[in-house]
Amino acid sequence: MSSIILRFRSKDGMFRITTDSSSNFTLVLEQLIEKLSQSGNNGNGNGNNNKIDLQSLTIANKPQDKGKSSYEFQNQTVNELGLKNGDMLYVNYESVTNDSGPTTTATNTTTNTASGNTIPITGPVPSIPINSVVTSHGPLKVEELPIDQELDKEDGLITRPLSSMCRHGPKGMCEYCSPLPPWDENYRKDHAIKHISFHAYLKQQLEKLKSSGGSYFPPLDPVDYSIDLTCNQGHKPYPNGICSKCQPSPITLQLQKFRMVDHLEFADSFILNDFINVWRVSGVQRFGYLYGRYAKSEKTPLGIKAIVETIIEPPQHDELDGITLLDWDQQEEKMVDQVANKFGLYKVGIIFTDLTDAGTKNGKVLCKRHKDSYFLTNLEIIMAAKFQLKYPNISKYSTAKNNGQFSSKFVTCVISGGLNGEIEPRSYQVSTSAEALVKADIITGCTQPSQIYVNESNNHRYVPDIQYSKINKYGLEVKSNAKPTFPGEFLLVSLTDSFPLQPTPIFTNSYVIENREFLGDENHDIQSLKTLHNYLKSNNDQIFNFHFILHLIKTHILNDQEIDLLIEYIKSKNLEDYLKLVESNGWMTLMTILEQSV
């Protein structure tokens, strides 16, 4: 964004401050205070530096106005105040003498805009220095995920052993063995880490803020490519009028340096195999929601991994080459989420298959997704962005205007063929730019799956200039016009995925999975009282399956307290909890009904 000049007239002369419209107005005031302090006039020609009583500093749009305290502009940007290049503001303040002290004031502040409007803000001003007021407004008070709270307390420093270059004892430290920050570029390249972790990126931004010595401002600010249809800066709303305040800036797309989630782990291989079996039996594709939890990933500094404990398959119509999602009853989906939350699980992503038999009769499948074709199609990228917008990440370091939301931890996993014909999962997210492009309705799919089409402007959508930037083989940055299409890979963020060497899943056995009635074979029964009876008879006290719990809740035989007893037993696997469950009235009623139904 281009720089602008704001003019400030005071009793010690006029001062010009160069800034840009996205800057926090507090940074402008800090520059102004520094110039006022160095003016050396003080109104009496004694040549000494001004000593400003910061509590008396007010800003107005007219020379006669008393104006408002500077404190009240602390959390607003130049753009939000409606200030334009060349605007004149009038500064009033008192000089501090050696025997004078701070005073408490309650003032009214107004600033003039390019259109002659004023912005009134009222309120009492505390008698503390301006820097203290600004820095006291730190991170938001929002409820973050436990993993974010845990990683926020860690420094993430990468320890290094003594090297041959060290010239000191075991208790010494030098540049060759001192810890590295978690965002270190050389470490990332040496360990083949494609993206730094979200918390490494966050700490890098906080470090930049700290080293600048400026006031606190949120280091996470989601991009917004939408035009402001409510802009009233002296013109009619778009499309009948437009100005630099309401229109989005030109967009430059580049590969995102960080990722919100670094790794996707399936708690046990049978979770994925059970999902893929639908294709093995029927040849049609399948879609599911990943329910799991977040934990630290040891492979990446300050990394996060999503551990999948179960897959829920909503109502859908499956075909050989596609999937159509049907309406999922909201009450049922809410019930699934609530039960999952009692296990400390959330929706962490989606999963779908894209498998085609290779015809070799040895279990191999076609490899359709690779660097010369695509990893996710344009429609899949847009779908992933919509899911990420639906399930936002909450961070106290984001802005209040976004309610603490910044990007998402929601993962998209596709099961497809590898280079050697093996079936393998591949996990992705899309960038914050992709989320903003979809939210602003700027992009859509096209006939070439690897390319994304840029929409045209219309009465409700303004599409700015869009470029995408990449590094060529000579190490130089090259920018290309993104219209009408650009490669979808510029919106992708890739994750790693795996299975644990020593699985410890919450749910350890199998049960009939819902919404698979169309399979109709002996290995895929429909959920019924008979399947409940057979499951309980064959497993005794080993009733550790999420789909079993959901089916049991749908029968409405057990009350809420008895369902909680069942969940507590599955979590603890304690025999005492099991005895409490089987001795309950609801469980005995269930056994009676099942015995009579056989």
Curated annotation (Swiss-Prot):
GO CC term (a single one): VCP-NPL4-UFD1 AAA ATPase complex
Family matches, as Pfam families: NPL4 (PF05021), zf-NPL4 (PF05020)
Regions of compositional bias (Low complexity) in chain numbering: 99-118
Subcellular location: Cytoplasm, Perinuclear region; Endoplasmic reticulum membrane; Nucleus membrane
CDD domains associated with the record: MPN_NPL4
Domain named MPN: residues: 264-403
Homology family: Belongs to the NPL4 family.
Protein's name according to its UniProt entry: Nuclear protein localization protein 4
Species of provenance: Candida albicans (strain SC5314 / ATCC MYA-2876)
Origin organism lineage: Eukaryota, Fungi, Dikarya, Ascomycota, Saccharomycotina
Gene it is expressed from: NPL4
